[in-house]
Amino acid sequence: RESLASGHVIDITTTGRRTGEPRRIEIVFHNIDGRLIITGMPRADHKRAWLANLEADPNLTFHLKDAVKADLPATARVITDAKERRIIAEWVSANAWKGQDVEAMTAHSPMIEVTILDPVLA
């Protein structure tokens, strides 16, 4: 649980929406009031493959890889609600990526909420 208490660099493995093959990437998560949130830098011109994979299949593996190493089964919920996206963007801009453009993040950053399926950690 302590490893999930604050944001870290992690890996996630998704299932390729076209190939069905596992796809592992490195990414950062944030713990925002007990919610595990993954977001990326805003890009209006590009949809991330990992996000498209999670839209097709919300199951993923959340890989802790710092002091604690664990492969945690999880599910993702893509965050689409504008108010919810703005709250997350404001938190990230104030606490993690200082000064990031809140408007750009709200409009163009990928955002998902992760639910860990391991009952000990959930």
Predicted regions, residues:
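Residues embedded in well-ordered secondary-structure elements
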Residues: 1, 16-18, 65, 103
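Short, structured beta-strand-loop surface elements
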Residues: 43-120
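Short beta-strand segments
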Residues: 7-43
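A generic structural micro-feature
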Residues: 4, 19-21, 54, 106
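Generic alpha-helix detector with strongest preference for long hydrophobic helices that associate
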Residues: 1, 10, 31, 35, ...
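Extreme N-terminal tail/first-helix region
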Residues: 1-8, 101
